[in-house]
Amino acid sequence: MRSILNMPVAALALALSPCTMAGDFDGSKQLICAPVEAAACASGEGCATGIPDDFGAPAFMRIDFLQKLVVGPKRASPIRSMDKTEHQLLLQGVELGHGWSMAIDAATGKMAVTMVDRHGAFVVFGACTPQ
């Protein structure tokens, strides 16, 4: 019973403590991200895999947390949602009729990105580094 009563106190202490996330991947520094692997999937058709260039993905993306943008060579996409946890940074937005999500590992900078619409999904894996 005593441990149950201490749970709210522990939760409050955790909520008020500073984030222990790696400083490079916590949203405090601009990042340059490079996609390395890609897959395009359509319902009932399976997935095609290849390098990101095969599917028209940019070679590099810059994440500007101050401006809340993911910037590529042709366009910039606003970051509509951002959530930090101990293990990852999650970003979300909408671009060209697709919903997108990006997850960046807080320790390594490895990333996974998805773009999805009613027809299928596009998945990219890669890595980010501080700019």
Regions found by a protein language model. Give the residues of each.
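Bacterial N-terminal signal peptides that target proteins for export
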Residues: 1-9
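N-terminal signal peptide c-region/cleavage motif recognized by signal peptidases
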Residues: 17-19
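Short, solvent-exposed loop/hinge segments that bridge or flank secondary-structure elements
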Residues: 27-67
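Edge beta-strand at a domain terminus
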Residues: 46, 51, 118-131
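Hydrophobic/aromatic beta-strand elements that line small-molecule binding cavities or substrate pockets
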Residues: 59-61, 99-106, 126-129
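Contiguous, well-ordered beta-strand patches that form the walls/edges
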Residues: 63-101
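Short, exposed beta-strand-loop hairpins at the edges of beta-sheets
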Residues: 103-104, 111-125
